[in-house]
Amino acid sequence: MRLPTTLLLFIGALIFSGAGTVRSDASDHRYKDGDSVPLYANKVGPFHNPSETYRYFDLPFCIPEGVKDKKEALGEVLNGDRLVSAPYKLNFRDEKDSEVYCKKKLSREEVEHFRRAVEKDYYFQMYYDDLPIWGFIGKVDKESKSDPSEFKYFLYKHIQFEILYNKDRVIEINARMDPHSLVDLTEDKEVDAEFMYTVKWKETETSFEKRMDKYAMSSSLPHHLEIHWFSIINSCVTVLLLTGFLATILMRVLKNDFMKYAQDEEAADDQEETGWKYIHGDVFRFPKNKSLFAASLGSGTQLFTLTIFIFMLSLVGVFYPYNRGALFTALVVIYALTSGIAGYTASSFYCQLEGKNWVRNLLLTGGLFCGPLFLTFCFLNTVAIAYSATAALPFGTIIVIVLIWTLVTSPLLVLGGIAGKNSKAEFQAPVRTTKYPREIPPLPWYRSAVPQMAMAGFLPFSAIYIELYYIFASVWGHRIYTIYSILFIVFIILLIVTAFITVALTYFQLAAEDHEWWWRSFLCGGSTGLFIYAYCLYYYYARSDMSGFMQTSFFFGYMACICYGFFLMLGTVGFRAALLFVRHIYRSIKCE
């Protein structure tokens, strides 16, 4: 237990040290009257397309003198954050009333640029003393008109800041756009714009330590919690009923099988065996494509370990709201540090299956998940570059990730592979395998791989689909998700149901005298990932307002990688459960 605990503390310390948080220049967040408080403009973009964001000054706002880019951590860059010094001066407890910071004549091209942005519901994001600020840049006045050509477009030119403070610390900031101070963008003509801002300070009793609670509470409101707990209870009841029903049948059938086989042993020796005992000489025959199978188990085990560590960090409060860069940092760091687990698992299991080319197996393990992810990233990063979006990673960040993969991930993968190869573990089979495989009898269509995968994936998916909406709304929207304890319960339910349904289907497969259960159990366990991807289609077209080539490609591209990861992880869980079950039942009977 000491190694996982030490690793968790190391990762947490690394993330807390600044790898993913938006840190101000004032490290202690204490200010005197008139002190400059850091204010950074982050990004702008269509409200319904969270991946399609641009630099704040890509819109033709007034660019002040001495604009500086903030040095960002890895997680911030991966999150698409591009912070620059903002044009507003919000010094501590310094009130301002309609102060003009810029007068500008907008050209026809700039008016058209702003109008397109307003039409797409562009919003902006800033950070003031690490606190997030949002607002829309303009509004569309439709006035009950159905013809879009008659709509009027306006740009907000007056932003009103209300800042709450407690003694020498900033506690909260709100930004409101003045609905009466507008610039008409409807016509393609030059327009004079006078941008201004107002600052009001108010004292509050809220402590500095609780200033982020406001953002976490939005997902913990009573009616939201009721929905989450209702979904949990509904999932638990459904799962208990279905798994209980299957367990009862399976236990009864197994009991009858054991009694039948015990009686057969006392009967005549020439009596023909039937059912799963009949194939005892083939059930532990190693699967085809041993190297790919072992690599899949190695990658799935690594992703399972990664998920557990992410849950541990979330439950101790590392991923608080608007510290989303920390999640990306944690994913990169933990994936790199756990690559040795993939190497060890794949190599040791491959050697147990009497594989000879362990180097090839190790290369396959290293590229099985990273390969598709890298190809997807290359395509999507090219799209982001074409759009000049902040999602396009800078060359320096790509070099950092390549160095992490080269100097950390790959060496640990090789070390784990060498350790697995030298473990000298033998595959534990309770019965001997015959020299020649038995022929599998003809089976009905519903016992083939695809129908079995459909049945195996539906039950686990039904246990998590309600919670999926909130996760999607957080990852691909602006909803805040902080109820990690509920999400962890859902994850445990998912694992239990996946393991159980895979065991049940494996038994029915063996009972039909089909001994090729290795790959089938893995595919059945991982099929929930396919259901999640099908849900992506439903969510995109029915529950979201995302649009455009970039957002569509980002959504389906990265969700394909995530669902593929779930496929490998849950496939590993399903196979491990099935292997324990098969070993148990064949250890419980006497086979010649």
UniProtKB/Swiss-Prot annotation:
- From the Swiss-Prot or TrEMBL record, state where the protein is found: Endosome membrane; Golgi apparatus membrane
One Pfam family assigned to this protein is EMP70
Query: According to its UniProt record, where is this protein mainly located?
Result: membrane
Would you indicate the residue range of the signal peptide? 1-19
Q: Which residues lie on this side of the membrane: Lumenal?
A: 20-229, 324-325, 387-397, 474-485, 543-553
Its record classes its membrane topology as:
Multi-pass membrane protein
Per the Swiss-Prot or TrEMBL annotation, the motif Golgi retention signal is positioned at 590-592
Q: Which residues lie on this side of the membrane: Cytoplasmic?
A: 251-302, 347-365, 419-452, 507-521, 575-592
Q: What UniProt keywords are attached to this protein's entry?
A: Endosome, Golgi apparatus, Membrane, Signal, Transmembrane, Transmembrane helix
Q: Provide the coiled-coil residue spans.
A: none
Q: Where is this motif: Endoplasmic reticulum export signal?
A: 581-586
Record-annotated membrane-spanning stretches: 230-250, 303-323, 326-346, 366-386, 398-418, 453-473, 486-506, 522-542, 554-574
Record's Gene Ontology CC terms? endosome; endosome membrane; Golgi apparatus; Golgi membrane; Golgi trans cisterna; mitochondrion; plant-type cell wall; plant-type vacuole
User: What disulfide bonds does the UniProt entry report for this chain?
Assistant: none
Matching InterPro entries, A to Z? EMP70 (IPR004240), MFS_trans_sf (IPR036259)
Q: Which family does it belong to?
A: Belongs to the nonaspanin (TM9SF) (TC 9.A.2) family.
Please give the record's comment on domains. The C-terminal KXD/E motif functions as a Golgi retention signal, certainly through the binding to the COP1 coatomer.
Query: This protein is called what?
Result: Transmembrane 9 superfamily member 3
Species of provenance: Arabidopsis thaliana (Mouse-ear cress)
User: Which taxonomic lineage does the organism of this UniProt entry have?
Assistant: Eukaryota, Viridiplantae, Streptophyta, Embryophyta, Tracheophyta
**Gene behind this protein:** TMN3
